[in-house]
Amino acid sequence: MAPRIIRGSLVRWSIVIPVYNEADFLPQTLTSIIAQTTAFHLIIVDNGSTDGCVDNARTQLAEYRGKVTFLYEPRPGQVYALQTGIAAVDTEFTAICDADTFYPPHYLAAATSLFDAKGAGYVAACAYLRREGLYKGLRSMMHRLLAARILPHQNHTSGAAQTFRTSALQAAGGYDPSLWPYVLKDHELMHRVLKRGHQVYHADFWCTTSDRRADRRNVRWTLAERLVYHLTPRSRQHDFFYRFLANRFDARGQRDTVLRERQWAVT
């Protein structure tokens, strides 16, 4: 579906949030989102939650004056929820957000400025995950900005911190479980999107994820796989994902649904 471009004083942004049992974190995330200084269409996709978080979100957003759409995706897996949410987007830009992440009030405004300044050749504006504390915050910023400068054709952030020109995102196929049903889907998606243009990072474009993540070994790649990714030239990235990494993830059972198990969360 081709996006309906909305310019001027009207809404240019859609925010897609996949949700599965996020009662402990979603309220704070929504509070940060409705504090944005830029107008947006909020799309919340319930992926089979059983903890009441979506009903609570309806109550929390009842008096919010912006446009909010609640969708239901019964197929288990964040990738399906994201696919459903992206299909409902008809604005110029799309922000993918996580239900456990804080977004500063200027988040969408910063992304808008980056897209408008860079022009149509830039298809993604990526935030970095800022860590708490002055030293850790500066280190996380410098790390991501340097990596993005050295390897501009690769992904250097979380899917919770990615924003896109909707036309490029949808033309690339968006999140697609038939192409990539595994973890690390944000990297695979960026591989496809960046075939259509460039990405931009900036020191003032950031967000902060929750500290609930502890042992993430079952939902991420190994150090060796990460090194291979960074050392693989752009012309061979297709083979890296679909011939190398997919086979390894499949053998380890690292499909997208492992994110629902929450064995990696702090309890």
Give residue spans per PLM region.
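A conserved acidic beta->alpha catalytic loop
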Residues: 46-55, 101
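Short aromatic/hydrophobic "clamp" motif used to bind/position activated sugar donors
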Residues: 94
